[in-house]
A protein has these predicted regions:
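Cell-wall polysaccharide-cleaving catalytic domain and substrate-binding groove, primarily
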Residues: 1-137
Length: 137
């Protein structure tokens, strides 16, 4: 592994800021995945698009409508420090953990994704790319 690969967070390297595991066929996937565990996308917008599609499914299909419910499923405690994850997302979005979310509320959904990506990758994403990914979803 080269030095750059060790410095750049995996989710950023893979254009997959929420670290979606391999499993679905996504628009914008790379032709050959070299990661083996997490999806890789041809651009950050496609990775963001996939994340928004999953978040929309969580809200509409699974009826997970709060930050706490969404993150509890997204980042189970078995693999993550769940309370810390939720606390950081709440702090960065300015929303309480039990606030009801609507997928149609673009600014809130974009803030949610940005906060989750910050927890997952430790970096702030480009707001324009987040909005573009939301519109692509």
């Amino acid at each position: 592994m080269d030095t750059k690969s060790r410095i750049v967070p995996r989710g950023i390297r893979n254009n997959n800021p929420l670290n979606i595991r391999i499993g679905n066929v996504w628009l914008g996937e790379v032709a050959v995945n070299s990661d083996g565990v997490f999806e890789q996308f041809i651009s950050m917008q496609y990775g963001i698009r996939a994340a928004f599609i999953l978040l929309r499914r969580y809200i509409r299909h699974y009826k997970l409508t709060t930050i706490e419910e969404i993150i509890s499923r997204w980042a189970p405690e078995v693999e993550n420090k769940l309370k810390a994850y939720i606390d950081v997302v709440c702090q960065r979005t300015g929303l309480p953990a039990d606030a009801p979310l609507s997928y149609e509320d673009q600014p809130t959904m974009c803030a949610l994704l940005a906060a989750m990506a910050y927890v997952e990758c430790g970096q702030v994403l480009d707001e324009k790319k987040i909005i573009e990914g939301y519109k692509m979803a």
